[in-house]
């Protein structure tokens, strides 16, 4: 079995054809064999698709149900020892090698009732492989080891990446998914590039999905996403700030100067370790239960590469489900972590 899943350096140009995702059949699972199918990465003629504005529509909330056998690298993290169902599935993941699953660190590093952070016991979870339905089909594989990024903290979402080592290879048909190197990532992360997110997360109305759902969105400029979030925060913060300015009798010029200073010091919600994907039209993003799952980019030759991991999105103001007016979600930028991923796999044979 190969120990490294780093793709070759790609010499790429964005394709401007805007081929429609809806016309392409999702990949169909077949016997994976003993080796991860990463050989396609050697081609220097790969190109990421550019999304047409009218294509950048659905999200997993309200997205369409994926066909049986589609997205054969998608796995579900489920509670061990319990019947598989939408209630026992809590996160997603992707097979990057025969016995290695890529997921989000926040899926396996949680807080207890007292607010103390802990790593989930590998024996407490299993990995469901080879099915798009949470109905008892597929192969439930035990977990041998869980390794989160050492810089991840439960109090924020930076470095939100983890690897899960399976106790054995799955016994059902599956495929693994390629991840990009840094050079390819620069191309994939261009605004307008088509992305596809899959998962069993919450749908409209807060209902859990028992079937894997797929949705097409697109890459958005991270700085624009940060600006949008900062403006939303500023609208709320400005209400209290204007009152404080009155109390302290600040002149208009002093108040504006102080406000600009505060805004300049505010940390950007999305770091360079994150990808922004969605649509500024709103209401099209991933949700709870999709966490840890893959954000993939379709390439012009019909193959796919995983650019991101579902990390976080905007919560509905009601506290239930996800924000229906949210325009985007944050995804872990996998390319930034390939050296760490390879190191973990090589040192944990």
PLM features: what roles do these ranges have?
Residues 70-72, 96-98, 122-124, 141, ...:
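Extracytoplasmic
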Residues 77-80, 199-201, 311-312:
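Generic short beta-strand segments
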Residues 67, 119-172, 182-185, 196, ...:
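Conserved catalytic-core segment of clan PA serine endopeptidases
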Residues 161, 167, 173-282:
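Chymotrypsin/trypsin-fold serine protease catalytic domain
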Residues 80-81, 166-170, 222-223, 299-301:
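Short loop segments at secondary-structure junctions
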Residues 2-9, 13-14, 18-102, 109-120, ...:
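Protease-domain processing segments flanking chymotrypsin-fold serine proteases, especially trypsin-like
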Residues 23-29, 37, 75, 88-128, ...:
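C-terminal subregion of chymotrypsin/trypsin-like serine protease catalytic domains
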Residues 145, 176, 275, 286, ...:
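Conserved beta-strand positions that form and line the central face of beta-propeller blades
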